[in-house]
């Protein structure tokens, strides 16, 4: 495979294969018949791409030789290649070697630069040679796949046969899985022999861990070997025994007595408890699963007796049932079990009740109790007896607090002396009152529904009277405070209203603070501190003082000085006689003096005053002004009264000599006028010139601004003088 392997594009109809310059032949001359000799449609291009990808995929892991554009050949294992690159095929070689250095003879130098992995970009690959490509990998993979699926298929068929014979369930428990009938193949055990030269431990010589009599401290070993100091404290997990306690011996004897009492109760057939207590048991017919992995689902003796009287579970399927729900009833509280059983037997017991009046009716037949009802009554009585025994044996393992004892005594005395409770029912004999048969039967039915517990004890419906039928008085609820009702106290009420009034307490605190002050009274504001503050859900400035809106004394003085300096600078800037409107800027508050002397100066380049004027001279620095032809000359309107106040030019524009100088005006060097007016210094004449000097001043307009602290006025005048 030679050439720059560029990825073919399905949108083009020409194949870009071979060398990157394959479109040019005979020394770079384009081949006119290239498109007519060989034409590739998209299907042919796709077939070539598939073949190339197949070869590259099968050559992964084999030796390849890559020739780069510089002529150097590299040999190595092909690890991966990028087929999505549009610049050719990127190649990654593992353990590269230099096979040919090409035009250069420095093979060793090239080999030193190579690492374990070499990445060659597609634009640098000129030739790729694949060696020893194994194209039979697909057949090997198919054969191995068929061998793997064959035993799996046989196992599936076996499971299907076993599933058809047994009940099909979606969820299988451990018992179902273990009893599925799979064949268990045991492996042949091989005797282990230690290798030659390896350290051999002889168990008979007492080198085992169990036979080591020396004490071993894991924390000390870790600290010695690894420098890890343990922070373990056994008292974080166990209760620390204080042996210095004077009651230590008494508590120790009590603990030993309780331990002996527990151990003397017997194991109840529990193998684990017997083993813990050191009792020898006969485990000849038990395996390890029965000894250590079995679960005793009987519970204690009370629940076992209750479960024996419950209905057997008719559902014997393979559905998984948690251990807590496998035997009904699953309630652990005996009171709940008793109430649930009484509700079930209530209707059955109510049908068996009868009255003497109903028995004496001519057409009525006295109902007889069936064996089923007798069994339910006997089971109920047995449960009641069990509950009585349980209540007698049960003891609270903790001492009752003293405050609870007072509450219990108070509740019992309240029940005895509470007059709001209805009176106890009074039992009457059947001969004390005669009722019609119809009324007697209907009353018996209603009363049997209301009080099933009294009927179950063998009393008839007319032999007793329920509480709801004898008393129609409304029961008043007991007082929340019990016998100790609170009494009103006017003094406490006044004290409560005074102590919790924030206005009164704030005034008292303010008066106490001013008691020791003998100075004269001043108008000090009276502040009341807010007792609490609840932050709102929106931004607020409630807690900010009004003083934050005014600056302090230092800041106010500094701001006043800054404003005063600013006013001085503004007044100096407004008094400037010259401004260049073409530049749009003020000339600043310069206090200048006229530069330039008579036009007949001996040195035209030094157009300055002689020693008689200012005692100094300044050289003339010409500053020509140029205007673009497409841009109008920015000439100010002289003496414009319609301009805004302060918005016009302060002094007339000083144009160049060829624009502003009139005929016969004195000219300086480079065609500029000899005198340029500046603002006069302090003590100058009214025209802005020095009092004892002479200079040329051009005609123009000027504006004078006078500002005071209270008012200002604007004067505009036109004057000309020499």
From Swiss-Prot:
Disulfide linkage: none
Q: Tell me if Mitochondrion is a UniProt keyword of this record.
A: yes
Q: Where is this cross-link: Glycyl lysine isopeptide (Lys-Gly) (interchain with G-Cter in ubiquitin)?
A: 344
- Gene Ontology molecular functions: mRNA binding; protein-containing complex binding
Q: Which PROSITE patterns match?
A: SM
Quick one: a GO biological-process term for this protein?
regulation of mitophagy
Biased-composition ranges, Basic residues, are 698-722
Per UniProt, subcellular location reads as: Cytoplasm; Nucleus; Mitochondrion
Give me the stretches of Low complexity compositional bias.
307-316, 338-347, 356-370, 412-421, 456-471
- Is Metal-binding one of the keywords UniProt gives this record? no
Q: What happens when the gene is disrupted?
A: Abnormal mRNA processing; 3' termini are cleaved but transcripts lack full-length poly(A) tails. Decreases HO mRNA translation.
Q: Which UniProt keywords apply?
A: Cytoplasm, Isopeptide bond, Mitochondrion, Nucleus, Phosphoprotein, Ubl conjugation
Amino acid composition bias (Basic and acidic residues), ranges on this chain? 1-10
Q: Which domain of life is it from?
A: Eukaryota
InterPro entries in alphabetical order: ATXN2-like (IPR045117), LsmAD_domain (IPR009604), Sm (IPR047575), SM_dom_ATX (IPR025852)
One CC-aspect GO term = mitochondrion
User: Where does the UniProt entry say this protein principally localizes?
Assistant: cytoplasm
Q: Which residues are annotated as modified residue Phosphoserine in the UniProt record?
A: 106, 215, 436
Q: Which residues carry this modification: Phosphothreonine?
A: 193
- What is this protein's function? Involved in pre-mRNA polyadenylation. May act to repress the ability of PAB1 to negatively regulate polyadenylation. Negative regulator of poly(A) nuclease (PAN) activity. Promotes mating-type switching in mother cells by positively regulating HO mRNA translation. Localizes MKT1 to polysomes.
**Misc note:** Present with 2870 molecules/cell in log phase SD medium.
Please give the family membership noted in the entry. Belongs to the ataxin-2 family.
How it assembles, according to the record, is:
Interacts (via C-terminus) with MKT1 (via C-terminus). Interacts with FIR1, IGO1, LSM12, PBP4 and PAB1.
The protein depicted here goes by the name PAB1-binding protein 1
Which species?
Answer: Saccharomyces cerevisiae (strain ATCC 204508 / S288c) (Baker's yeast)
């Amino acid at each position: 495979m030679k050439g720059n392997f560029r990825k073919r594009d399905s949108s083009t109809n020409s194949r870009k294969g071979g060398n990157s310059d394959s479109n040019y032949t005979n020394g770079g001359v384009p081949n006119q018949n290239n498109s007519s000799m060989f034409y590739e449609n998209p299907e042919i291009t796709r077939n070539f791409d598939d073949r190339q990808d197949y070869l590259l995929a099968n050559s992964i892991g084999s030796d390849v030789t890559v020739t780069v554009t510089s002529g150097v050949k590299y040999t190595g294992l092909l690890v991966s290649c990028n087929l999505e690159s549009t610049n050719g095929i990127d190649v990654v070689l593992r353990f590269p070697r230099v096979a040919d250095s090409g035009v250069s003879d420095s093979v060793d130098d090239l080999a030193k630069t190579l690492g374990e992995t070499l990445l060659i970009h597609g634009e640098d690959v000129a030739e790729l040679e694949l060696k020893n490509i194994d194209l039979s990998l697909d057949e090997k993979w198919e054969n191995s796949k068929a061998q793997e699926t064959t035993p799996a298929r046989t196992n599936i068929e076996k499971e299907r046969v076993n599933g058809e014979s047994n009940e099909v369930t979606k969820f299988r428990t451990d018992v179902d899985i273990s009893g599925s009938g799979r064949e268990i193949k045991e492996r042949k055990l091989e005797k282990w022999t230690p290798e030659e030269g390896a350290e051999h431990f002889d168990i008979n010589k007492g080198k085992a861990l169990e036979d080591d009599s020396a004490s071993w401290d894991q924390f000390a070993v870790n600290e010695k070997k690894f420098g890890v100091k343990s922070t373990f404290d056994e008292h974080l997990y166990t209760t620390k025994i204080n042996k210095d306690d004077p009651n230590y011996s008494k508590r120790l004897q009590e603990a030993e007595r309780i331990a002996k009492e527990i151990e003397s109760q017997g194991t109840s057939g529990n193998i684990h408890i017997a083993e813990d207590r050191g009792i020898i048991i006969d485990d000849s017919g038990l395996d390890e699963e029965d000894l250590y992995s079995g679960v005793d689902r009987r519970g204690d003796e009370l629940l076992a007796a209750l479960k024996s009287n419950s209905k057997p579970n008719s559902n014997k399927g393979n559905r998984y049932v948690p251990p807590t729900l496998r035997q009904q009833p699953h309630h652990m509280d005996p009171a709940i079990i008793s109430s649930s059983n009484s509700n079930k037997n209530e209707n059955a017991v109510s049908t068996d009740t009868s009255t003497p009046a109903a028995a004496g009716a001519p057409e009525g037949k006295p109902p007889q109790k069936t064996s089923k009802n007798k069994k339910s009554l006997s089971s109920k009585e047995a449960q009641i007896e069990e509950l009585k025994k349980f209540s007698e044996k049960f003891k609270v393992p903790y001492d009752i607090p003293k405050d609870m004892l007072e509450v219990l005594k108070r509740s019992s005395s309240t029940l005895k002396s509470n007059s709001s409770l209805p009176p106890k029912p009074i039992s009457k004999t059947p001969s004390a009152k005669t009722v019609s048969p119809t009324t007697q039967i209907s009353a018996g039915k209603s009363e049997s529904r209301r009080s099933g517990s009294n009927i179950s004890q063998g009393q008839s419906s007319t032999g007793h009277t329920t509480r709801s039928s004898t008393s129609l008085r409304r029961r008043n609820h007991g007082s929340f405070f019990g016998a100790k009702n609170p009494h009103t106290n006017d003094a406490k009420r006044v004290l409560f209203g005074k102590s919790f009034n924030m206005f009164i307490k704030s005034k008292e605190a303010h008066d106490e603070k001013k008691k020791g002050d003998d100075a004269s009274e001043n108008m000090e504001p009276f502040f009341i501190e807010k007792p609490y503050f609840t932050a709102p859900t929106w931004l607020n400035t409630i807690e900010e003082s009004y003083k934050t809106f005014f600056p302090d004394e230092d800041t106010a003085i500094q701001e006043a000085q800054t404003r005063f300096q600013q006013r001085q600078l503004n007044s100096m800037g407004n008094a400037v006689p010259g401004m260049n409107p073409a530049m749009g800027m003020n000339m600043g508050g310069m206090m200048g003096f006229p530069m330039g002397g008579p036009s007949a100066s001996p040195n035209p380049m030094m157009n300055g005053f002689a020693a008689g004027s200012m005692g100094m001279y300044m050289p003339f620095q010409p500053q020509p002004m140029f205007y673009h032809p497409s841009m109008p000359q920015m000439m100010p309107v002289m003496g414009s009264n319609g301009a805004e106040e302060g918005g016009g030019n302060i002094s007339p524009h000083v144009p160049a000599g060829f624009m502003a100088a009139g005929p016969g005006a004195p000219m300086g060097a480079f065609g500029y006028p000899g005198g340029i007016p500046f603002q006069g210094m302090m003590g100058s004449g009214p025209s802005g010139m020095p009092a004892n000097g002479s200079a040329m001043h051009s005609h123009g307009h000027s504006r004078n601004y006078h500002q005071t602290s209270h008012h200002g006025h604007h004067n505009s005048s036109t004057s000309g003088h020499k």
